[in-house]
Swiss-Prot record:
GO terms for molecular function: ATP binding; ATP-dependent protein folding chaperone; isomerase activity; unfolded protein binding. It comes from Staphylococcus aureus (strain bovine RF122 / ET3-1). Its EC number is 5.6.1.7. Its main location: cytoplasm. Belongs to the chaperonin (HSP60) family. InterPro entries: Chaperonin_Cpn60_CS, Cpn60/GroEL, Cpn60/GroEL/TCP-1, GroEL-like_apical_dom_sf, GROEL-like_equatorial_sf, TCP-1-like_intermed_sf. Forms a cylinder of 14 subunits composed of two heptameric rings stacked back-to-back. Interacts with the co-chaperonin GroES. This is Chaperonin GroEL. Pfam families: Cpn60_TCP1. It is an enzyme of class 5 (isomerase). It is found in: Cytoplasm. Keywords: ATP-binding, Chaperone, Cytoplasm, Isomerase, Nucleotide-binding. It catalyses: ATP + H2O + a folded polypeptide = ADP + phosphate + an unfolded polypeptide.
Length: 538
């Protein structure tokens, strides 16, 4: 494909037009009085949203140079969303401010490399100051405040707070669409996996079609069990203890399944067989998780273990197991706490190292099941459009809350960034490096300025007063009042604010040091003239 090129000022100005188009569409949503953006959807109703990253992803510009500029800012939003889960609009506003101010200086003859050094220096000091001003999130009310501010809805904040209280900070909280009007919270305690009983004759409650096992033994193996004789010695030991058993295996079939069902119907013993969850290597890992949670040993050829040699002390135990047609839930496994903690740490390390979103999601699910359970927030709304918008807000609020628990909170509404202004202004530098520091200084006030303008106020007036206010005191755009932001519950997660600043600075620095842009020339549609119809035939 043939390429076209632009150089120096022409290249940067073309990309700046793209940056401005995307940023101007996104920044109208920031703050409590931010507006919505309507996104056209080809086969469904238009989506109305104020979620920065969702808007950014939809923008595709016709001009290839402008589109590259837009994609750079889109990358800021995506990266911030990936790391912190929220703060995408703040990151976009910061990136636009740094790029605009930086480009003015480059046009005036400043050295882009010097500007980059100044930007990096200023951001490092700003991030350190943010961490110094950060406060830990320690109770349920503070968690609810973070969620409520992010979603602009107190009820959502309360649901997230309750969910985190019940399943722990590492627990999985999923967001699903409800068929009703109301939003509800549902909690599944313990480890649940999507495999049910292998025969309906295994149920203990025929009305509910559920098998409920109290204080059961749990056999965990990756083998197929076809012969009843293979597990008979083990089952005899279980029968003597007068306790039920859950068999988790690759598959229970043939003679083994028939005899388990017959003995269950005769009342000889209570046994429920389920297929092992997952596939391939993931199945092995999930079986190990279950074994660690319940104190079992996985019966596998990898360890040189055979079912015939299995004894009762190789089985795990739990306070309760519930098996339905589709799911198995293990509650309060009796595994060793130290082993569980070690497994949790291992999974956290794998989550940090993996580059695959799919793998990360599956690892987080496994972590949650070990750490305490799964909570489901079922989102209700009056229309499909409202449902989608509400679901996006809850996802952002959940991510914000997790970030707050991880790194603490700072004053919200852009106040935290202005609070570090003084520290950054004390950096000693000269020449283009000093100019780079000044670019960041101006950008630090951009979110507050935009929040004020979205509320119909003069941004510059609010910024100047905020610079002279006590640390933590900020402008509440929802009520047009000056308040202590932390006391008023107007807070932002430190991780979100920090990530937004770092990613915005990174892209701005790359933008300013760009000297040439290479783009593909769009192919023209050379429509062929219509062929005349065939002449009539005799």
């Amino acid at each position: 494909m043939v390429k076209q090129l632009k150089f120096s000022e022409d290249a940067r100005q073309a990309m700046l037009r793209g940056v401005d188009q995307l940023a101007n569409a996104v920044k109208v949503t920031i703050g409590p009085k931010g507006r919505n953006v309507v996104l056209d959807k080809e086969f469904t109703a238009p989506l109305i949203t104020n979620d920065g990253v969702t808007i950014a992803k939809e923008i595709e510009l016709e001009d290839p140079y402008e589109n590259m500029g837009a994609k750079l800012v889109q990358e800021v939003a995506n990266k911030t969303n990936e790391i912190a889960g929220d703060g995408t609009t703040t990151a976009t506003v910061l990136a636009q401010a740094m790029i605009q101010e930086g480009l003015k200086n480059v046009t005036s003859g400043a050295n882009p490399v010097g500007l980059r050094q100044g930007i990096d220096k200023a951001v490092k000091v700003a991030v350190e100051a943010l961490h110094e001003n950060s406060q830990k999130v320690e109770n349920k009310n503070e968690i609810a405040q973070v969620g409520a501010i992010s979603a602009a809805d107190e009820e959502i904040g309360r649901y997230i707070s309750e969910a985190m209280e019940k399943v722990g900070n590492d627990g999985v909280i999923t967001i699903e669409e409800s068929n009703g009007l109301n939003t509800e919270l549902e909690v599944v305690e313990g480890m649940q996996f999507d495999r049910g009983y292998q025969s309906p004759y295994m149920v203990t409650d025929s009305d509910k079609m559920v098998a409920e096992l109290e204080r059961p033994y749990i056999l965990v193996t990756d083998k197929k069990i076809s012969s009843f004789q293979d597990i008979l010695p083990l089952l005899e030991q279980v029968v003597q203890s007068n306790r039920p058993i859950l068999i988790v295996a690759d598959e229970v079939e043939g003679d083994a399944l028939t005899n388990i069902v017959l003995n269950r119907m005769r009342g000889t013993f209570t046994a429920v067989a389920v297929k092992a969850p997952g596939f391939g290597d993931r199945r092995k890992a999930m079986l190990e998780d279950l074994a660690i949670l319940t104190g079992a040993q996985v019966i596998t050829d990898d360890l040189g273990l055979d079912l015939k040699d299995a004894s009762i002390d190789m089985l795990g135990t739990a306070s309760k197991v519930e098996v339905t047609k589709d799911n198995t839930t293990v509650v309060d496994g009796d595994g060793d706490e130290n082993s569980i903690d070690a497994r949790v740490s291992q999974l956290k390390s794998q989550i940090e190292e993996t580059e695959s979103d799919f793998d990360r999601e599956k690892l987080q699910e496994r972590l949650a099941k070990l750490a305490g359970g799964v909570a489901v927030i079922k989102v209700g709304a009056a229309s499909e459009t409202e449902l989608k918008e509400r679901k996006l807000r809850i996802e952002d609020a959940l991510n914000s809350t997790r970030a707050a628990v991880e790194e603490g909170i700072v004053a919200g509404g852009g106040t935290a960034l202005v609070n570090v202004y003084q520290k950054v202004s004390e950096i000693e530098a000269e020449g283009d490096i000093e100019t780079g520091v000044n670019i960041v200084l101006k950008a630090l006030t951009a979110p507050v300025r935009q929040i004020a303008e979205n509320a119909g106020l003069e941004g510059s007036v609010i910024v100047e007063r905020l610079k002279n206010a006590e640390p933590g005191v900020g402008f509440n755009a929802a009520t047009d009042e000056w308040v202590n932001m932390l006391e008023a519950g107007i807070v932002d997660p430190t991780k979100v604010t920090r990530s937004a600043l770092q990613h915005a600075a990174s892209v701005a620095a790359m933008f300013l040091t760009t000297e040439a842009v290479v783009a593909s020339i769009p192919e023209k549609n050379n429509d062929q003239p219509n062929m005349g119809g065939m002449p009539g035939m005799m």
